[in-house]
A protein has these predicted regions:
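Acidic, carboxylate-rich catalytic segments that either coordinate divalent cations
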Residues: 2, 203-240
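Structural helix-adjacent loops and short alpha-helical linkers that scaffold large soluble proteins
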Residues: 67, 71, 108, 203-210
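Alpha-helical bundle segments that constitute or directly flank the non-heme di-iron/ferroxidase center
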Residues: 16-23, 32, 36-65, 137-161, ...
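Acidic, low-complexity proline/glycine-rich segments
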Residues: 2-28
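Accessory, usually C-terminal, subdomains that scaffold auxiliary metal cofactors
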Residues: 173-216
């Protein structure tokens, strides 16, 4: 992949463009045009909890290979996800994902009882492999998913915001009761800028910028495949 000609700012512009292009892909269009039923919302909620777990795995690998100061930056990001913000009464995001399932009629046991999608498992493995690449590729592969979920960067709203609006429309569940979705609508705006913080110091060569673009592009490719598997799963369930 070739970098854009305008250095770091040009690279950032390209990354934002790539994130917006996700929503023009067939898998994303299928997913955001789904009609949610209770059964579909339940299965989607369960699979997204597995997705959150995979994000924690991947960021752990990224942190392990990154320079010390970037390890600290990643930990600041992951502290919200793994521990929450106790001072604000906010729980970790795995707990939030399970608790959000309650509004769809799920118990905590349902998250343990239901298996991961086979296609989802393959995508999770692919993301872990990306997280084990050179650290710039690896951090881009994980951070680009935060950018793709930032309402500040995505025209028409982030994926979390769109899904939340669909659930409110189809099931009458307000966003404030979708506690995990609502949290990501807010937090991923903040987290989306992590990659630019890294790039300002470390993406000072074309090789480094190309590594970031490559890691991001491959992660978004996996993301499209994963959303396609989610759309497939939802389509197998009754639409009424």
């Amino acid at each position: 992949m070739k970098t854009t000609p305008n250095g770091i700012d040009g690279m950032w512009t390209e990354l934002v463009h790539m994130c917006n292009e996700q929503f023009e892909s067939e898998p994303f269009k299928r997913l955001v045009n789904t009609k949610f039923t209770k059964a579909r919302a339940q299965q989607y909620s369960i699979q997204m909890a597995f997705y959150v777990q995979n994000r924690r795995d991947c960021w752990g690998y990224v942190q392990g290979s990154a320079p010390l100061e970037i390890k600290k930056l990643i930990w600041q990001h992951e502290e919200d996800e793994l521990i929450g913000r106790k001072s604000e009464g906010k729980q970790d995001h795995i707990t939030l994902a399970v608790k959000e399932g309650e509004v769809f009629g799920l118990t905590a046991e349902a998250f343990e009882r239901n298996p991961r999608l086979e296609g989802g498992e393959v995508c999770f493995s692919a993301w872990i492999r990306l997280a084990q690449r050179s650290w710039l590729e690896a951090i881009a592969a994980s951070a680009i998913l935060e950018m793709r979920n930032s309402g500040e960067l995505i025209q028409g709203g982030s994926l979390s915001k769109r899904i939340g609006a669909m659930l409110e429309r189809d099931l009458g569940i307000p966003m404030k009761k979708q506690i995990n979705t609502a949290e990501h609508v807010v937090m991923d705006v903040e987290h989306a800028h992590l990659l630019m913080q890294v790039a300002r110091k470390y993406a000072d060569t074309e090789t480094a910028r190309n590594a970031i673009l490559q890691g991001a592009a491959e992660s978004l490719m996996v993301d499209r495949v994963y959303r396609g598997h989610l759309a497939d799963m939802l389509e197998t369930l009754p639409d009424n």
